[in-house]
Amino acid sequence: MMLTALCDSRLRRWNWPLSTAQTVGGLIALIWLPLMSYVLLGTALGRAASYILLPGIPAVLALYIMALRSWRESTIAMVGVTLICFWLLVAVAVPYLPLLDPNKPLAPLVAPGTVKNGVLFVLGSDMRGRDILSRTLWGCQRVLVWGITATLVAYIVGAGLGLIGGYLGGWWDEAVSFVCNVLLSFPVMVLLILILNVLGRSGFNILIAVTCSTAPMIMRIVRGLALDAKTRDYVQAAQTRGEHPVWIMLVELLPNVRGPLIVDACLRLGYTTVAITTLTFLGMGLQPPDPDWGLMIKEGAPAALLWKYSYMLIVPALSVSSLILGFNLTADGIREMSARD
């Protein structure tokens, strides 16, 4: 809660609309509080650390309450935030829930709602006898950790390069634009697979691959906004005062091009989630045995040819779809609010 309030107060100093400042402040807090340790610190240490991240639960609830107060007039935004906060809350609370071991074989191909060997399988079990409910809830944590982290890294790199190219111009702009145009010449999935084949399959390499495929798009957006903003009076006033170019880019340019970037960030989270899930489905992403939605879809696809086992595919597919829908609806809601403000 203190971190959320601190982020909120910092963002208000940039004269953001109150609703946008509160929302972004909560999102920044959520990026760091509840999710980072599980995969980034390694499976055993990360899972142990996730049990002490109890402050993440009130952080998610605080974000949702702030959104309720600020976005009451936007039904689309509230639906999107509800979906996102639901999965964030699941990701934070899953260590405390009385779930079965997601990797333990119990009874194969048990139908949803069936009790077998004294165990209730709410959403059934897969071909290896593992509980689908447990794997779905634990899997959302991996997807959110890597999706948020990859998008954050891509935005840091892309926005930094875009500000440098747009503000400084000259050979800086030519060099950055050339590299980005080369990367953009590859189809996204082809570039991701190529990088992972060269570097190997690991979580860190996924971050590199997603950054290389996403940062050029962000760079072009930020560069265009910076080219327009650097001609404004407030930038020229900062130049007259003798401010350092880095200070001008971070304090004058970046806050004043925030609107399109916030909307794009929400959409980019959805794109990154699709990319990571697809890579896992193709066997190029996060590796088993830990649960992941893309891996669950891959394992459930053959069994789903028979309708009685289609739940193995439907459950993770609906989970991915609902999370992506939440990001997209939130982006639409922020766009509506920005237009009103």
Describe the role of every protein-language-model region:
Residues 78-82, 90-125, 282-291:
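Hydrophobic alpha-helical transmembrane segments of membrane transport/permease proteins
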Residues 199, 210-213, 259, 263-269, ...:
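C-terminal transmembrane helix and the adjacent membrane-cytosol boundary/short C-terminal tail
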Residues 184, 196-198, 210-211, 224-226, ...:
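Glycine-rich helix-loop "coupling/hinge" segments at transmembrane-helix boundaries
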Residues 14-51, 57, 61, 76, ...:
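Generic hydrophobic transmembrane alpha-helix motif, especially the helices
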Residues 82-93, 148, 152-160, 164, ...:
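Generic alpha-helical transmembrane segments of integral inner-membrane proteins
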Residues 6-20, 30-51, 67-70, 99-150, ...:
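Periplasmic/extracellular loop-to-transmembrane helix junction in inner-membrane transport proteins
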Residues 171, 225-234, 334, 340-341:
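Transmembrane helix boundary and interhelical loop/hinge segments in multi-pass membrane proteins
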Residues 130-145, 149, 169-177, 230-231, ...:
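Amphipathic cytosolic juxtamembrane alpha-helices at the membrane-cytosol interface
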